[in-house]
């Protein structure tokens, strides 16, 4: 049975197609269906994949729990997918939660005491763990024990509980916000990088097969090169292009259909959308190309500072459209040319395309 796609939204307040975070619970369910189950199926992140393959094989050979794993990098690159793959390859169950959900020590203790031998506990947004919960986690990671306080007041006493050996997989987009004691307790640390166009085209082709969509190699590449180096965005664009092709192109996604669909969706050949162009135009037209502080920029375009720093900027910086300097944000020569303008003398040169054409 083919995986059902979500509907094409034309609401003005619809989430950005090129946003790296999941847009809706429905999208998350589609992502789960498209997710590779084993390392052999996992595309890209060659260094992290090869390391995990060795570490998992060694742990299985010794019948031990895999060492604790920290996965960090921009959103949408496959941290959750890798956590599921680790559990699958180890032949164990995975419990999933997130840092903000674990408000009290008891929340974490309940999860830890229910883990079976060598199970995987996946904590997304681990940088958002509260300090009191983090303190409970330290002895669990080091000694597979937790201290529970029973009773209240003068009669309260601490009881030490033994845990089954387990693997913590932590995921974060903000590795710098992790405390040093927590970071030091991870034996395996992997940074996930933006994907190149070839790997994304492979992912798009695989996903199209699961979605029962007819796509040519050229059509897959056209979708991939606008996906901002991010598999989640590639799969989202694929679903929208698939909708267009079914209505306007006889169901076949070739270069022409992909180009027409993405033009309709206002995603340009470089993967920039309206929000990206709005930010770049503000720097160029309102602040003469910069430098401009992020707070001033946020006010100029009506966005939150965190949205600019976490969602919009990473791609623009990696792709050579924006420079972050001590004095503020500056547009590069690539930005001026992209907007059809002549770069002023002394403007910043581009750092180039890091994802591959």
From Swiss-Prot:
The record ties this protein, via SMART domains, to:
AAA
Per UniProt, the enzyme's principal EC class comes to hydrolase
Write out the biased-composition intervals (Polar residues): 1-10
Identify one Pfam family in the record.
RuvB_C
Could you tell me the EC number(s) of this protein? 3.6.4.-
Q: Which GO terms describe its molecular function?
A: ATP binding; ATP hydrolysis activity; four-way junction DNA binding; four-way junction helicase activity
Write out the residues that bind DNA.
305, 324, 329
Q: Which controlled-vocabulary keywords does the entry list?
A: ATP-binding, Cytoplasm, DNA damage, DNA recombination, DNA repair, DNA-binding, Hydrolase, Nucleotide-binding
Q: Return the annotated region ranges for Large ATPase domain (RuvB-L).
A: 5-195
List the catalytic activities from the record: ATP + H2O = ADP + phosphate + H(+)
Region of interest: Small ATPAse domain (RuvB-S): 196-266
The record's region (Head domain (RuvB-H)) falls at: 269-357
Entry's Gene3D superfamilies?
Answer: 1.10.8.60, P-loop containing nucleotide triphosphate hydrolases, Winged helix-like DNA-binding domain superfamily/Winged helix DNA-binding domain
Q: Where does Mg(2+) bind?
A: 80
What task does this protein carry out?
The RuvA-RuvB-RuvC complex processes Holliday junction (HJ) DNA during genetic recombination and DNA repair, while the RuvA-RuvB complex plays an important role in the rescue of blocked DNA replication forks via replication fork reversal (RFR). RuvA specifically binds to HJ cruciform DNA, conferring on it an open structure. The RuvB hexamer acts as an ATP-dependent pump, pulling dsDNA into and through the RuvAB complex. RuvB forms 2 homohexamers on either side of HJ DNA bound by 1 or 2 RuvA tetramers; 4 subunits per hexamer contact DNA at a time.
Q: Which family does it belong to?
A: Belongs to the RuvB family.
**What is this protein's name?**
Holliday junction branch migration complex subunit RuvB
Q: Which organism is it from?
A: Bordetella avium (strain 197N)
């Amino acid at each position: 049975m083919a995986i059902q796609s979500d509907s094409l939204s034309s609401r003005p307040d619809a989430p950005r197609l090129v946003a790296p975070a999941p847009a809706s619970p429905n999208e998350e369910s589609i992502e789960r269906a498209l997710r590779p189950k084993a390392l052999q199926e996992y595309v890209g992140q060659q260094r992290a994949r090869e390391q995990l393959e060795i570490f998992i094989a060694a742990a299985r050979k010794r019948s031990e729990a895999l060492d604790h794993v920290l996965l960090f990098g921009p959103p949408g690159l496959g941290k959750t997918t890798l956590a599921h793959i680790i559990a699958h390859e180890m032949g164990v169950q995975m419990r999933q939660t997130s840092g903000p959900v674990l408000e009290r020590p008891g929340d974490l203790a309940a999860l830890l005491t229910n883990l079976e031998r060598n199970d995987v506990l996946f904590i997304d947004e681990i940088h958002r763990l509260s300090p009191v919960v983090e303190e409970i986690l330290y002895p669990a990671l080091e000694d597979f024990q937790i201290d529970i306080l029973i009773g209240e007041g003068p009669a309260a006493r601490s009881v030490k509980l033994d845990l089954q050996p387990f693997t913590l997989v932590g995921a974060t987009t903000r590795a710098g916000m992790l405390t040093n004691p927590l970071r030091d307790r991870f034996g395996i640390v992997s940074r996930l990088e933006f994907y190149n166009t070839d790997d994304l085209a492979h992912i798009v082709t695989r996903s199209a097969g699961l979605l029962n969509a007819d796509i040519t190699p050229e059509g897959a590449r056209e979708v991939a090169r606008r996906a901002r180096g991010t598999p989640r965005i590639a799969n989202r664009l694929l679903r929208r292009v698939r909708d267009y092709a079914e209505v306007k192109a006889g169901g076949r996604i070739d270069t022409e259909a992909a180009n027409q669909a993405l033009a309709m969706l206002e995603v340009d050949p470089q993967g920039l959308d309206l929000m990206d162009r709005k930010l770049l135009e503000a720097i160029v037209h309102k602040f003469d190309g910069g430098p401009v502080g992020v707070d001033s920029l946020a006010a100029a375009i009506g966005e939150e500072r965190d949205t600019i720093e976490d969602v919009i900027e990473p791609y623009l910086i990696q792709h050579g459209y924006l420079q972050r300097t001590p004095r503020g944000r500056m547009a590069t020569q690539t930005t001026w040319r992209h907007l059809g303008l002549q770069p002023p003398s002394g403007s910043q040169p581009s750092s180039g395309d890091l994802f591959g054409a």
